[in-house]
Amino acid sequence: MNHATSELHDESAVTDVPETTRVQDLLALVKMGIVNSNTLTVFTGFWLALHFNGLNALEHLDKMFFTIVGSALIMAGSCSLNNYIDRDIDHLMERTKNRPTVTGKYKPGFVLTLGVTLLLLGFVFLLLTTAMAALIGFIGAFTYVVLYSLWTKRAYTLNTVVGSVSGAVPPLIGWAAIHPSLDHPIAWMLFLIMFIWQIPHFLALAMKRVDEYRNAGIPMLPVVHGFDITKRQIMIWTVCLLPLPFYMSGLGITFMIIATLLNIGWIVLGFYGFRKKDDIKWSVQMFVYSLNYLTILFVSMIVVTFF
């Protein structure tokens, strides 16, 4: 980029920056939306561990607090470090161009310090529950920051699969805070659901934002191999979710029916994509469905334990 182009970019960056408060900038820095959605899965893992071990939630409120806060801090710290790492390419993508690391509202040194501090605090909180919960939290952070953000994101189409490991550990953190041996199949079904769910979820997003990823040089599957292969991969991973509820019979027939209907709905919508001419519109529908799917599924897991 020559000097004149740099000046033009800097000038446009300043004029295009939306008005935001410090609180809004901080929430964007730690990706509060991701933190909130993953905190739900942490709580679900924690709640189900209580349920299947016959424990009273009121007697473990301290652990609940340490688990939720510790997990949220680790996720916020990891997301801050991801923003720090991606600050050189985020301006190339529409959905990330207004992040505070791009607009200059937060300096790189502050973002790095904040990320590390939040991670350390999160590990301390989780250590107040069990060592296993803290270890799983470390594995999730290491996978997201190092294996995904620093290594595979800009190098391999498998970056989505690698990143899905970090997104699958939150319910295991919640479970391990109560029952660190992790010897119950429900715990691992939670992990598998989260791991598999993320791949069609993020591939749909990659289709929707394919031009942005291409412009940023990120080798997402639709960028490298096109929409047809991506749609097939989305369908394969979505179908893989279908049998998992039947390994969670301990949650009862109501949950199994809800989960199966959600899976069938996603599969039907997925197959519709092979007949639909507007791939971008279909990818948006798949992305939105995946968000609703996860919320309904995990809330259902909690609700059915009351009956």
UniProtKB/Swiss-Prot annotation:
Ranges annotated as spanning the membrane: 32-52, 65-85, 106-128, 132-151, 158-178, 186-206, 251-271, 287-307
GO biological process, one term: heme O biosynthetic process
Keyword field: Cell membrane, Heme biosynthesis, Membrane, Transferase, Transmembrane, Transmembrane helix
Coiled-coil residue spans: none
Membrane topology: Multi-pass membrane protein
Annotated localization: Cell membrane
Keyword Transmembrane included in the entry's annotation: yes
PROSITE patterns named among the record's database cross-references: UBIA
Major location (coarse): membrane
Enzyme Commission number(s) from the entry: 2.5.1.141
InterPro entries cross-referenced by the UniProt entry: Protohaem_IX_farnesylTrfase, UbiA_prenyltransferase, UbiA_prenylTrfase_CS, UbiA_sf
Reaction(s) catalysed by this chain's protein: heme b + (2E,6E)-farnesyl diphosphate + H2O = Fe(II)-heme o + diphosphate
Pathway given in the UniProt record: Porphyrin-containing compound metabolism; heme O biosynthesis; heme O from protoheme: step 1/1
MF terms in GO: protoheme IX farnesyltransferase activity
GO cellular component: plasma membrane
First-level EC class: transferase
Subunit description: Interacts with CtaA.
NCBIfam families: cyoE_ctaB
HAMAP family: CyoE_CtaB (MF_00154)
General function of this protein: Converts heme B (protoheme IX) to heme O by substitution of the vinyl group on carbon 2 of heme B porphyrin ring with a hydroxyethyl farnesyl side group.
Note in the entry: Carbon 2 of the heme B porphyrin ring is defined according to the Fischer nomenclature.
Family membership: Belongs to the UbiA prenyltransferase family. Protoheme IX farnesyltransferase subfamily.
Identification of the protein by name: Protoheme IX farnesyltransferase 2
Source species: Bacillus cytotoxicus (strain DSM 22905 / CIP 110041 / 391-98 / NVH 391-98)
